[in-house]
Amino acid sequence: MQLKTMPKKKPLSAGRAPLFLFLCQMISALDVPLDPKLLDDLVQPPTITQQSPKDYIIDPRENIVIQCEAKGKPPPSFSWTRNGTHFDIDKDPLVTMKPGSGTLVINIMSEGKAETYEGVYQCTARNERGAAVSNNIVVRPSRSPLWTKERLEPIILRSGQSLVLPCRPPIGLPPAIIFWMDNSFQRLPQSERVSQGLNGDLYFSNVLPEDTREDYICYARFNHTQTIQQKQPISLKVISVDELNDTIAANLSDTEFYGAKSSKERPPTFLTPEGNESHKEELRGNVLSLECIAEGLPTPVIYWIKEDGTLPVNRTFYRNFKKTLQIIHVSEADSGNYQCIAKNALGAVHHTISVTVKAAPYWIVAPHNLVLSPGENGTLICRANGNPKPRISWLTNGVPVEIALDDPSRKIDGDTIMFSNVQESSSAVYQCNASNKYGYLLANAFVNVLAEPPRILTSANTLYQVIANRPALLDCAFFGSPMPTIEWFKGTKGSALHEDIYVLHDNGTLEIPVAQKDSTGTYTCVARNKLGMAKNEVHLEIKDPTRFIKQPGYAVVQRGSKVSFECKVKHDHTLIPTILWLKDNGELPNDERFSVDKDHLVVSDVKDEDGGTYTCAANTTLDSVSASAVLRVVAPTPTPAPIYDVPNPPFDLELTNQLDKSVQLTWTPGDDNNSPITKFIIEYEDAMHEAGLWRHQAEVSGTQTTAQLKLSPYVNYSFRVMAENSIGRSVPSEASEQYLTKAAEPDQNPTAVEGLGTEPDNLVITWKPLNGFQSNGPGLQYKVSWRQKDGDDEWTSVVVANVSKYIVSGTPTFVPYLIKVQALNDVGFAPEPAAVMGHSGEDLPMVAPGNVRVSVVNSTLAEAHWDPVPPKSVRGHLQGYRIYYWKAQSSSKRNRRHIEKKILTFQGSKTHGMLPGLQPYSHYVLNVRVVNGKGEGPASADRGFHTPEGVPSAPSSLKIVNPTLDSLTLEWDPPSHPNGILTEYILKYQPINSTHELGPLVDLKIPANKTRWTLKNLNFSTRYKFYFYAQTSVGSGSQITEEAITTVDEGKKAGILPPDVGAGKAMASRQVDIATQGWFIGLMCAVALLILILLIVCFIRRNKGGKYPVKEKEDAHADPEIQPMKEDDGTFGEYSDAEDHKPLKKGSRTPSDRTVKKEDSDDSLVDYGEGVNGQFNEDGSFIGQYSGKKEKEPAEGNESSEAPSPVNAMNSFV
């Protein structure tokens, strides 16, 4: 992947890219490098930097100054031509040239006339690399001629006639500005009826009697000479026919009045311009002004349109009551026919103005300075346009190229000069002249052939801070000839950056479009050309963006209540945000009801005008966020007006007896509102240091109206007073007048002075600076003094600005210093401060503790001892000793897991310490290190020790499996921490009867290598509690307990336990011995009697020839664990010895709540007992046994055993 390079807007046309492109990016418009000192020795042809305008009109009453400034290396010399010939300034004593400049000063104020120096001037700036020339500067003195004397006859008109009052000002230079006023210098009012034309004449569409006056005066203002000329006043009288007296009516005819227009209503006609058509020519870029003024009665209205087009919306303006159409910045596209239409109630008239837009020359591509290295190619382009098209001509060093010295590296092709294989002799200044009949353009562009090794102009070690996920731009402004190539590297040994995440701009800037945290680091810019190499390092830090944690929310509150807006932000810890609250995008009202703390804006006693949008803006030096919320104020629920209230604020505050350090304040109390004033609180504002912040000054009794206040120097005091009664405190009074006390020397020094090094070779002196109030005068500074405590050195002092830290470099490591910080200002010093002691920077300790030894206290506790290190080797404040200890692992275990080290730190100079929590029967290793404020020193040699045996932990698990009628099997896992060699296991158990009483305890010792044991000869259906623990030679460990129940007899085994209890799960239950219950004995007797009756009935039916050989079939399907009942005596069969100890199926365990898995017996009583449909045929034989039915739902058991069903009991006999 290659580093992306941003494309240039316009590629170069020939050869390698010349240096002028990057020079334009790093050099100002005048080609001055960003760092002039860096390029002081760079040879450069002249460049005109300042000159007078082409048409230079001067004030003939002042000295003539014709500017010509230029720069170059070496500095250029200057010469002038006047009217095309050399102007020898040495021959004219009135003409001087400013030193180091080409500016001419012609002293006509002492003698001489400005008209003598009219002419066309041109300046030439020349050095060894070429010559630059200025524009042709036409110098003309301004003129403001007087009006010619004339006699103006009074004008008499009938009402309604039109009128034009001519101005015809004298021709001046520049043209005068015309306006009409009366003899009181008040401008004459203008309207759609009366207005001034572009030529200065005053036009009346129709006259009215109120136009009668004798002082219509035209004024011409000549701005250049700041003079005003005036025409003779014109008298106008407007009369109506009704006003004519008999004499006038008899002696004058209608045509003898001024003008022949009728005073009756008439359609419009144009006063200007004349005729139906006219032509207007204007230059490109100027303001096109078209005018149409009409007369008529009633007054006509003017409209404007453009034929075959529309008027440009953003450039069209109407002036003079729409009588003038103006189009700014006209171009050739504005040419065409424009029509003005004058209309009144009697008709309309129109006039067409044909507009042609011509153009003086203007640049398409102006030539730019060209910097090349020897052997390179380059191009100068000079392209201009105009109407008519301008002619392009070239000059070199002010001489037309046709007659200039020939240069083999130069080839001219119209508006382009091409250079190939340039040499230092090719350096010159070229002038391009583009001209037509309307004007000319002249541009200087130099060709400078240089051979310079690369130089980087960006400051070294510049730090850039950027918010994450935003672009980062790292500058590398460079210079060199030939143009250097630029490469960027990250880190001190990184490779060149060639990844897509970077963009390299032509000016050397490295852009990271989306900077991330891992973009942080040092970047190196390297510039190379064939003459050498230069590099520069910059640093980039990526900061977390500022974001809201809590934003203000919409609120609706009642008038008079309080509302709070919360605004919390999370920001980068290195940036300090400022929170600004705004109301309706403006500042908060200057009202104490608005209070702002760190995260909240609180508005108390809300008023209707408080409604609006409140914005919280959080700003850091790198980013900002804002959030807004709307507050709506509603009417409150009516409440009774209070009888009592806080006092009204005091007023009429006055300062008297004004001294340097005291003043007397007097005031007039406000109304106490039916509750006596108990005290007055006086606050002050320091407008100089803490404007807008009011602080407590004093309190006086409620009966006083004056207070003598102590003042501090150099404080601009304002005071205000609040009154307080039992209801509360009044609002503050209006502020008093300000009183500025005189400055004095500080009367206190900074506090919290400390000296603490941050590096081994420095001492950082910090203090809490004085605030502005404490400064006592302007120019607050601090005198910082220090010297070694144990040396004979003199105090070293430095005066620093109003800061809070000073760093002393080059100090020895951890040496005590005496430090003083004294305040001073422009008036003097504060009292001599007391010295405090500090230390230069710490370094890591040099020596490890020696003679480390360990004594074992018991199996879990040991004590370590060591010898202290020499104090000088600590190289800092001794914070203590740190012990690292860990349990040694075998090589196989070390490979499987990381060794966990434990750390204990013993403060101060202790040389021993206890190591608790050790594991018995283990091998441990430890080492000791000394600790200071910088960190840890080297570790001592590892020391090993063994802990003796201890008692083991409890067995990891204990399970009761395979319960039978008289046995239980225990399985367990050894202790997780044997803490020695296990010698045996101890098992204790005891039965629990139905009343939860414990029976006799049985002890049993089991060999240590066993993990399974079977207990025999237990009571059936009995709960047992087990206690189990391991032993070492030291003693017994913690025990684990469990409970389990042996199984019940076969009748009870057949499904009386709840189905949700898994086999073999040992659990506690509340067991009731039902065998001793009276109801159970009675039930058993009833069941026995019922069984006997059924046996007799069955026997009789069998003797009569029953349908099925029941006995044989039932014997074939009988449960293998149950013996059939004897036929001869009718009693139940007993369990055999073999079956008493017959193990359960593999993996089965009988739970303590006596649930038996259904697959253990197909003849489960639950299938046929009470609550289940009977499964017998008409002769009582068991049908289910032959139907193959296996899946029966087990019944839920309870805490007492159920009596067996007589039907199921019958199944066991046959």
Swiss-Prot record:
| Location in or out of the cell | Cell membrane; Cell projection, Axon; Secreted
Which parts of the chain does the record assign to the membrane side Extracellular? 30-1077
**Ranges of Basic and acidic residues composition bias in the record:** 1109-1129, 1151-1160
* UniProt cross-references to PROSITE patterns, sorted A to Z: FN3, IG_LIKE, IG_MHC
Instruction: Tell me which positions the record assigns to the signal sequence.
Output: 1-29
Read off the PANTHER family from this record.
CTX-RELATED TYPE I TRANSMEMBRANE PROTEIN (PTHR12231), NEURAL CELL ADHESION MOLECULE L1-LIKE PROTEIN (PTHR12231:SF257)
The name this protein carries in UniProt is: Neuronal cell adhesion molecule
Q: Which organism is it from?
A: Rattus norvegicus
